[in-house]
From Swiss-Prot:
The active site is at C180 (acyl-thioester intermediate). Its main location: cytoplasm. Residues 33-216 form the BPL/LPL catalytic domain. It catalyses: octanoyl-[ACP] + L-lysyl-[protein] = N(6)-octanoyl-L-lysyl-[protein] + holo-[ACP] + H(+). Keywords: Acyltransferase, Cytoplasm, Transferase. It comes from Herminiimonas arsenicoxydans. One of its GO terms (molecular function) is lipoyl(octanoyl) transferase activity. The record marks K145 as: Lowers pKa of active site Cys. One of its GO terms (biological process) is protein modification process. This is Octanoyltransferase.
Length: 216
């Protein structure tokens, strides 16, 4: 993806997951080879989402939070206020004839964008082989998860779903699930680590980092 075809960035504000999910699918259904790629920035009310591989028993107690089955990869995760969510609506064939091979590179680019975003706030984080997402790389909470990702890549190379980064959340609902299918996985947010920032600032930073890596 060249700089001239950098994705359009759309701020959708706070929106229910079901509305965004339906909109992503409709956008992808309707897109053509000429449709511009887009990044959608959104904040969701509380919701648990299940990936295609999800075991419903990893939702230990949903309380009154909706549980939504999706068509993304991965297991169960939680979205809620104070979390940056960016969905990537891309056509991987535009610059990569074999979209499936590029999919692995895409995951690396997304993860690196998150790592770079956190580094801007002096938070050292890393990826883990075989466990998509971003984790603290040092300190007493080493291994705690701060960002999750899951994608849907259709046979025509078009993607949707994306990445979530915990900024300043009520983390309690993460204890009601086995996050990403891992029992006992600790989940953390930027605020708990001392980062002084706002949701809007992190949205802007992550969108910029994603655009830069996708254009590289």
């Amino acid at each position: 993806m060249s700089a001239s075809t950098s994705p359009l960035i759309r701020q959708r504000g706070r929106e229910s997951y079901e509305i965004t999910y339906a909109a992503m699918r409709a956008f992808t259904d309707a897109r053509t080879a000429q449709t511009a790629d887009e990044l959608w920035i959104v904040e969701h009310p509380p919701v648990f989402t299940l990936g295609l591989a999800a075991d419903p028993t990893h939702v230990l107690d949903a309380h009154d939070i909706p549980v939504v089955q999706t068509d993304r990869g991965g297991e169960v995760t939680y979205h809620g206020p104070g979390q940056v969510v960016i969905y990537l609506l891309l056509d991987l064939r535009r610059n990569h004839a074999d979209a499936r091979i590029f999919a692995r590179e895409l995951v690396n680019k997304i993860e690196q964008a998150v790592i770079d975003t956190l580094a801007a706030y002096n938070l050292a984080c890393e990826r883990k082989a075989g466990a998509p997402g971003i984790y603290l790389s040092d300190g007493p909470l080493q291994g705690a998860k701060i960002a999750a990702l899951g994608l849907k890549i259709r046979g025509n190379g078009c993607t949707y779903h994306g990445v979530s980064l915990n900024v300043a959340m009520d983390l309690t609902p993460f204890s009601w699930i086995n996050p990403c299918g891992y029992e006992g996985l600790v989940t953390i947010d930027m605020q708990s680590l001392g980062a002084q920032t706002t949701l809007t600032a992190v949205q802007d930073t992550l969108a910029e980092k994603l655009t830069r890596h996708l254009s590289g």
